[in-house]
Amino acid sequence: MFMGEYNHIIDAKGRIIVPSKFRDSLGEHFVVTVGLDGCLFVYPNEEWQHFVEQLKNLPGNKEARQLQRYFMAGAADCEVDKQGRILIPGNLRQHAGLDKDIVFVGVLSKIEIWSKERWESNSYDNMDEIADHMSEFGLSF
């Protein structure tokens, strides 16, 4: 399970150091794809295969095909180099607006990669709103 928030910098070649707490759980090879809300999703291979199976089992309608294209066209196989970095392809950097400061966010079975600016604008500052969402989904402490 992935959790936590880690700030890093992306270099001029599009490489980012993966937080050490995430490296073991990611494994040697994993998938980076377009995410929702302007971020990237990073899946360990096992989780990615599970997600792909769900995409395969969608009906053949237009909406399902759009979802399949969205996630599969943006997907890239990645691996961590000897310095603990991953190379984010240009199209994915552009999708997420990654240019310098980035944030890794652990979200259960996947990792999200955000530009720091987008992350800060999407973060919840309103605790009442969070409490309302928790109640709406039946969550309690």
Curated annotation (Swiss-Prot):
Predominant cellular place of this UniProt entry's protein: cytoplasm
Source species: Lachnoclostridium phytofermentans (strain ATCC 700394 / DSM 18823 / ISDg) (Clostridium phytofermentans)
Localisation per UniProt entry: Cytoplasm, Nucleoid
InterPro entries: MraZ, MraZ_C, MraZ_dom, MraZ_N, MraZ_sf, SpoVT-AbrB_dom, SpoVT-AbrB_sf
An example Gene Ontology molecular-function term: transcription cis-regulatory region binding
Record keywords: Cytoplasm, DNA-binding, Repeat, Transcription, Transcription regulation
Quaternary structure annotation from Swiss-Prot or TrEMBL: Forms oligomers.
Tagged with keyword Transferase: no
Family under the similarity heading: Belongs to the MraZ family.
GO terms for cellular component: cytoplasm; nucleoid
Pfam families the UniProt entry points to: MraZ
Protein name (record): Transcriptional regulator MraZ
The keyword Transcription is annotated on this UniProt entry: yes
GO terms, biological process: negative regulation of DNA-templated transcription initiation
Span of domain SpoVT-AbrB: 5-47, 75-118
